[in-house]
């Protein structure tokens, strides 16, 4: 079981980051709310991970702290929620925002996330609310929004294409992802900025 990585960031391709540890490169899938806080390529990062084994793949999911990882692990226990959908949920909302939405029973906020319909949102509220009762010490303080900051990244010529690809990887349809990015696109924005603003606008 791989629970934590400490190494140098080799490449950032949202929502994937490649981290080299002891000469081995690990591909880690990260929610965009965690991805924003990563240092730039060439710098050291510490990532808490959850290892998922499927018939066709072995995948690492990464988080900036244990609380985010705990929430991810609880999410994938919910009926109908797999790692990909959990990643999309925590990309559209920070962990704290998701906890708040569940505790306030905000179905309307949850259904705006990719892959979440009304029934899934209601199921998440019912199942996760019960689990939060025993997890508060290991999660977050209710009703306090988590403020995220991210290092500035230089804009690239293909920032829009990277942003669209990342949104598709998170569960949005290609046409929908393109439309989301085109609405907020600007020439001086990095792909990370475009992804963050597109997700924020969708909510």
Curated annotation (Swiss-Prot):
Residues 143-154 are annotated as: Flexible linker. GO terms for biological process: DNA recombination; DNA repair. Residues 1-64 are annotated as: Domain I. Residues 65-142 are annotated as: Domain II. One of its GO terms (molecular function) is ATP binding. The keyword DNA damage applies. Residues 155-203 are annotated as: Domain III. It is found in: Cytoplasm. GO terms for cellular component: cytoplasm; Holliday junction helicase complex; Holliday junction resolvase complex. Keywords: Cytoplasm, DNA damage, DNA recombination, DNA repair, DNA-binding. CDD domains: UBA_RuvA_C (cd14332). InterPro entries: DNA_helicase_Holl-junc_RuvA_I, Hlx-hairpin-Hlx_DNA-bd_motif, NA-bd_OB-fold, RuvA, RuvA_2-like, RuvA_C, RuvA_C_sf. Has three domains with a flexible linker between the domains II and III and assumes an 'L' shape. Domain III is highly mobile and contacts RuvB. Belongs to the RuvA family. NCBIfam families: ruvA. The RuvA-RuvB-RuvC complex processes Holliday junction (HJ) DNA during genetic recombination and DNA repair, while the RuvA-RuvB complex plays an important role in the rescue of blocked DNA replication forks via replication fork reversal (RFR). RuvA specifically binds to HJ cruciform DNA, conferring on it an open structure. The RuvB hexamer acts as an ATP-dependent pump, pulling dsDNA into and through the RuvAB complex. HJ branch migration allows RuvC to scan DNA until it finds its consensus sequence, where it cleaves and resolves the cruciform DNA. Homotetramer. Forms an RuvA(8)-RuvB(12)-Holliday junction (HJ) complex. HJ DNA is sandwiched between 2 RuvA tetramers; dsDNA enters through RuvA and exits via RuvB. An RuvB hexamer assembles on each DNA strand where it exits the tetramer. Each RuvB hexamer is contacted by two RuvA subunits (via domain III) on 2 adjacent RuvB subunits; this complex drives branch migration. In the full resolvosome a probable DNA-RuvA(4)-RuvB(12)-RuvC(2) complex forms which resolves the HJ. This is Holliday junction branch migration complex subunit RuvA. It comes from Shigella sonnei (strain Ss046). The lineage of its organism: Bacteria, Pseudomonadati, Pseudomonadota, Gammaproteobacteria, Enterobacterales. The gene is ruvA.
